[in-house]
UniProtKB/Swiss-Prot annotation:
Record PANTHER family: MITOCHONDRIAL DNA REPAIR PROTEIN RECA HOMOLOG-RELATED, RECA
Protein name: Protein RecA
UniProt key word Nucleotide-binding: yes
NCBIfam families from the UniProt entry: tigrfam_recA (TIGR02012)
SUPFAM superfamilies with a match to the protein in the record: P-loop containing nucleoside triphosphate hydrolases, RecA protein, C-terminal domain
Species assigned in the record: Cytophaga hutchinsonii (strain ATCC 33406 / DSM 1761 / CIP 103989 / NBRC 15051 / NCIMB 9469 / D465)
Residue positions binding ATP: G74, P75, E76, S77, S78, G79, K80, T81
Record's GO cellular component terms: cytosol
Function description: Can catalyze the hydrolysis of ATP in the presence of single-stranded DNA, the ATP-dependent uptake of single-stranded DNA by duplex DNA, and the ATP-dependent hybridization of homologous single-stranded DNAs. It interacts with LexA causing its activation and leading to its autocatalytic cleavage.
Gene Ontology terms for molecular function: ATP binding; ATP hydrolysis activity; ATP-dependent DNA damage sensor activity; damaged DNA binding; single-stranded DNA binding
Amino acid sequence: MSKSTSTPNPQNEKLKALQLTIDKLEKTYGKGTVMKLSDEVVMDVPVISTGSLGLDIALGIGGLPKGRIVEIYGPESSGKTTLSMHCIAEAQKAGGIAAFIDAEHAFDKTYAEKLGIDTTNLLISQPDNGEQALEIAEHLIRSGAIDIIVIDSVAALVPKAEIEGEMGDSKMGLQARLMSQALRKLTGAINKTGCCCIFINQLREKIGVMFGNPETTTGGNALKFYASVRLDIRRIGQIKESADNITGNRTKVKVVKNKMAPPFKVIEFDIMYGEGISKIGEIIDLGVELGIINKAGSWFSYEGTKLGQGRDAVRTVFLDNPEMQDEIELKIRQKVQLSGVPAAMEAKELEEEEA
């Protein structure tokens, strides 16, 4: 009898060789080093709320993505640090550990506490130079214990050579080189550990720009490329109780870059002095926008009940009736399909469960 010889299938041989290589790589570098996209169902991106309901909606995923780099930039006193502090407070509320690299040496503990930050459990560092700041950040991120880290600000990350040099010395491109090198090292660690890394940045103007926007951010172009989300925050007006009494700022945030959802969304909210982002103001604005609160002229009403004339009157009603505020917030979240439950409702549910 003649034996039938089967010819080897080149495709099978390729797949075998590929599997052997993957097994070898996983043995060396750990499981999941190389995998097919079909091997694992892509889960929703874990996020940290920004503390602004409108901004969470504008970001498309419900907040800032974990395991990614975020840049918040804008002019002076526009609310950059306030927004990042709200992110820290939200991360802490969710049981996370937060760190703040204060390169500007301007951290205000009292203000941070007013925004809801638990300062007793906040890790803070005030480094002497840019290299030290980024090394501290790298070690904290690589520990795998940090959920959110804020670096305030890129402009204050002064290279060691510049600090040690004379006042008039030219140090062209030193900071840009430092940022580029640091981001190359940090990106992988940030992604692996699932830490949300926020860089606060300042604006500068390019000299001699005749056409287009002369504004640019400090620290070179590296951060623009490495950031998954870039937020442009600006003050657009003042909130006054009377002609002489200014109580806050009207603020506009534009999602300039977003790798997680469609970008270029714009949101406006109030930042009140000593309070931060006004949650009530946002609920009123979003409630009207989504048709949950009815507005006729200057009068506001909800489910047939008149709330008052003007935003300030509605604000007072919500302060006296937090249950109504939470109910409207829940309806807003359901309408835009945003996960999460208002904090007061969550606390009430926990109390009921314990009872």
